Amino acid sequence: MCETASTTLPPGITPISGDEARRLIHHTSGPELEALLDRAEAVRRAVHGDEVALCGITNAKSGRCPEDCGFCSQSARFEGADAPVYPMIGAGEIVEQAHKAERAGAREFSIVASGTRLAREQELATVEEALRRLRAETAVEPCASLGLMREPELRRLKDAGLMHYHHNLETARSHFENVCTTHTFDEQLETIRAAKGLGLKLCSGGILGMGETPEQRVEFAEEVRDLGVDCVPVNFLNPRAGTPLAHLKAITPEECLAALAVFRLMMPAAHIFVMGGREVNLGDRQDLIFRAGANGTMVGNYLTSAGRAPDLTVGMVERQGLTLRPPDTGKPWAFDGHAPSDADWNRKAAEPRPRPLPVVR
C-alpha cells in the first residue's frame, strides 16, 4: 500500500509551508473550499495517479486496555464504554479475516490489538505465526498495530513477514495531554522511529475532531510529515458512549475535506487514507475524499463499530473513475472485481468468536 515518503515529486509539485497550511485550513466554504479541493486533487493525480488502495483490519484482541485515550471505548478506565472484550484470537482466525478482506479488495491487512503493548510472549508468537501464514497464503501486504514496541520485538515481526507498522500519533503534541495521559507523545515517537530504523514502512496518523483547533491540525500534520511516514491514516472522531470525548460534536464535512486537502498539499508523496468516522462525519459526501487528496480508504468494519459494506466502498471508488491498486507482493490477488454485499459480508463474518472475558475496571 505504501511507498516511501521520499518519492521523487513531479516537476511543479512542492509541499506547501506550515504558514500557508494554517491559512488554507480555514477555507471551509464556497469558492475557497472548491479551489482548495481542486488543488489537492491535482496533486493527488500528479503524484499517485488514479489508483486507490483499500486497507482491511482485524480486531485481534479487544478491550481491557489500561490506557486512558479519551476517544477509545476499549479502555478499562471508562464506566459505560461497551467495546467487546476478548483475548488474542488464534492465527487461523486472523488469516481467515485476511482472506475475507482480500476478496473485498484490500491491498493491506492489519492485525490490531488493544493494550499499551503485547503483554505476553504467546501473543507475540501468535502474531508471528499469523504473519508467516499471511505471506504464504494470501497476497495482502501484512501490517500490525500492536501499541508501543521495542526494536527486538519489531525485528521478530519483520522476520516473520511484517511489511508495515502502524502507530498513530493521534493528535498534535500541544493537544496530546488533553487526549491521553497514561503514555507520552515521545514514547509514541520512539516506537515509530524504531520501526523506521528496521526499514519497515510506516503508517502514522490520527483523529480529527477531538477538540483541537484548526491550527493544531496543521501542527499534527507537520509532526507526521517530519517523521517521513509512508502512509497517513486520517480518522474523524465518532464519539463513543462512556468515553471522555463522547460529548464532542462532530466536525463538519467541510472541515474534514479542508483538512484532508491541506494534508495532501503538505505531504504530496504520502499515501493519505481516510479511515474511521467517515460515515458519521461526511455522510453522503464521502465520495469527495478523493477530490480532497486521499488515495486510500478502509474496507469492512472498524475496531469497535461497523463500516460500510465492501461493495459500497468499491463502488464509491469506481464512481470517481478510479481503480483499486493491487498488492505489491507479487502473488495472485483474490479480488475478482466484485466485493461482497452487506448480507454476504455479514454472513461470512458470523463465525464463532472467542468467549468474551469480564471487563476489568
Swiss-Prot record:
Starting at the broadest rank, the lineage of the source organism is:
Bacteria, Pseudomonadati, Myxococcota, Myxococcia, Myxococcales
- List compositional bias (Basic and acidic residues) regions by residue number: 339-354
One GO biological process term: biotin biosynthetic process
Metabolic or biological pathway, per its Swiss-Prot or TrEMBL entry: Cofactor biosynthesis; biotin biosynthesis; biotin from 7,8-diaminononanoate: step 2/2
Subunit and interaction comment = Homodimer.
Q: Which Gene3D superfamilies match?
A: Aldolase class I
Describe cofactor binding as the record notes it.
Binds 1 [4Fe-4S] cluster. The cluster is coordinated with 3 cysteines and an exchangeable S-adenosyl-L-methionine.
Kindly provide the name given to this protein in its UniProt entry.
Biotin synthase
Q: Which annotated residues bind [4Fe-4S] cluster?
A: 65, 69, 72
Q: What is the species of this protein?
A: Anaeromyxobacter sp. (strain K)
| Matching Pfam families | BATS (PF06968), Radical_SAM (PF04055)
Residues noted as binding [2Fe-2S] cluster in the record, renumbered to the chain: 110, 143, 203
Alphabetic keyword roster: 2Fe-2S, 4Fe-4S, Biotin biosynthesis, Iron, Iron-sulfur, Metal-binding, S-adenosyl-L-methionine, Transferase
SUPFAM superfamilies membership = Radical SAM enzymes
According to the entry, every stretch annotated as the Radical SAM core domain falls at 47-278
Instruction: Kindly list the cofactors needed.
Output: [4Fe-4S] cluster; [2Fe-2S] cluster
Chain spans, region Disordered:
323-361
* UniProt EC number: 2.8.1.6
Q: Which HAMAP family match?
A: BioB (MF_01694)
Report the PROSITE patterns cross-referenced here. Answer: RADICAL_SAM
Q: Which reaction does it catalyse?
A: (4R,5S)-dethiobiotin + (sulfur carrier)-SH + 2 reduced [2Fe-2S]-[ferredoxin] + 2 S-adenosyl-L-methionine = (sulfur carrier)-H + biotin + 2 5'-deoxyadenosine + 2 L-methionine + 2 oxidized [2Fe-2S]-[ferredoxin]
Functionally, this protein is described as follows: Catalyzes the conversion of dethiobiotin (DTB) to biotin by the insertion of a sulfur atom into dethiobiotin via a radical-based mechanism.
The gene name on file is: bioB
| Single GO term (MF) | 4 iron, 4 sulfur cluster binding
Give yes or no: UniProt keyword Iron: yes
Of which family is this protein a member? Belongs to the radical SAM superfamily. Biotin synthase family.
